[in-house]
Swiss-Prot record:
One of its GO terms (molecular function) is structural constituent of ribosome. This is Small ribosomal subunit protein uS14A. Keywords: Ribonucleoprotein, Ribosomal protein, RNA-binding, rRNA-binding. Binds 16S rRNA, required for the assembly of 30S particles and may also be responsible for determining the conformation of the 16S rRNA at the A site. GO terms for biological process: translation. It comes from Lactococcus lactis subsp. lactis (strain IL1403) (Streptococcus lactis). GO terms for cellular component: cytoplasm; small ribosomal subunit.
Amino acid sequence: MAKKSKIAKFKKQQKLVAQYQELRQELKKEKNYEALRKLPKDSHPNRMKMRDRIDGRPRAYMRKFGMSRVNFRKLAHEGKIPGVKKSSW
């Protein structure tokens, strides 16, 4: 489980990215780099480290499912992820 402060920071960062997304695109089209530079640092999506939706774990994140491999494995074994089943060969 990640620290509560890290999860809160991630949520705040998501809001900032969404808030400045359109403005950032307009400024890029206009090639107004001075105005882009004045935007908040955390409003750029590249600075965001994706986290597990369940417990906030930052490593081994699986984009397709929005969770880390640890929680993916646990939920897949319990049969709680639709369309995922254990394979054997």
